[in-house]
Design a protein with these regions (language model features):
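Short conserved beta-strand and strand-loop elements enriched in small hydrophobics
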Residues: 8-13, 56-65
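Core segments of small alpha/beta cavity-forming domains
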Residues: 117-163
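A short, sequence-level motif marking secondary-structure junctions
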Residues: 23-30, 71-78, 210-214
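Exposed beta-sheet edge and beta->alpha loop/turn motif
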Residues: 1-2, 74, 182-233
Length: 233
């Protein structure tokens, strides 16, 4: 409703401050958008480091006198109608937006929406243990070690979350099995596919994440031992 179909608006990338113009083409539970011109496409690709990516990024939508916290991915897919050098469209998510195939909001997009709104720390602290694990795994797949660190207990010596960005290109969560909270502890099990930089192989893993409730902080944090599980080939 804020961005009617075929409306144009400006987006600002939170990390770089770079802006570009876009048009909403379709979408109902989230917006399918396209860069407006070839120059806008070039600006978007610059924001993504010169390569298209499914990674989510925090953005602010500037529409009239409104500033709306949002999240994008940077991968052209599907149909595109504008002559802009962008082969398809990409997705723009807001608070509680969902994808075409799932009824629940996308965890990675929601992390970035709240980052854009200046509520990242609060949002992570308010998540239940299952949703926190999903958010941490998604951010690990993006190599966003700064956000991963916000969701985990201090890693032991020899475990460096920074290795995620250096080694892992992507993590695909194929399915998950939720656990039960017992004595301030929650364990979730995930079947994931891990892809490493410079390696075309798919590494299928079954990993376990354990969250512990930190009474002094009033929130959940994930134990960091899952990092070693992800990084083992």
């Amino acid at each position: 409703q804020l961005l009617p179909r075929y409306s144009t608006f400006t987006l600002m990338d939170l990390e770089t401050g770079l802006t570009w113009n876009a048009q909403r083409r379709a979408g109902s539970f989230h917006a399918d958008i396209q860069p407006l011109t070839n120059q806008d496409t070039l600006q978007l690709k610059t924001i993504y480091g010169g390569s298209w990516s499914w990674n989510r990024r925090a953005v602010v939508v500037l529409a009239g006198n409104r500033r709306i916290a949002a999240s994008i991915n940077g991968m052209p897919h599907g149909a595109g109608a504008l002559k802009n050098g962008f082969p398809g469209h990409h997705c723009l998510h807001f608070w509680e937006s969902t994808t075409h195939t799932k009824s629940r909001p996308d965890p990675a997009h929601q992390v970035m929406v709240h980052k854009a709104a200046g509520r990242l720390h609060t949002y992570l602290a308010e998540l239940d243990p299952n949703d926190l694990q999903l958010a941490v795994l998604e951010m690990a797949g993006q190599g966003d070690t700064a956000i991963v660190r916000l969701g985990i207990l201090n890693p032991p010596d020899g475990t460096n979350p920074g290795q995620l960005a250096a080694q892992i290109q992507n993590i695909n969560i194929r399915d998950s099995q939720q656990g039960e909270v017992e004595d301030g502890r929650y364990t979730g099990r995930y079947n994931v596919s891990v892809y490493f930089h410079g390696d075309n192989s798919e590494y299928r893993k079954s990993i376990t994440l354990t969250s512990r409730y930190q009474a002094d902080l009033g929130r959940w944090l994930v134990e960091p031992d899952f990092l070693a599980q992800l990084l083992t080939r």
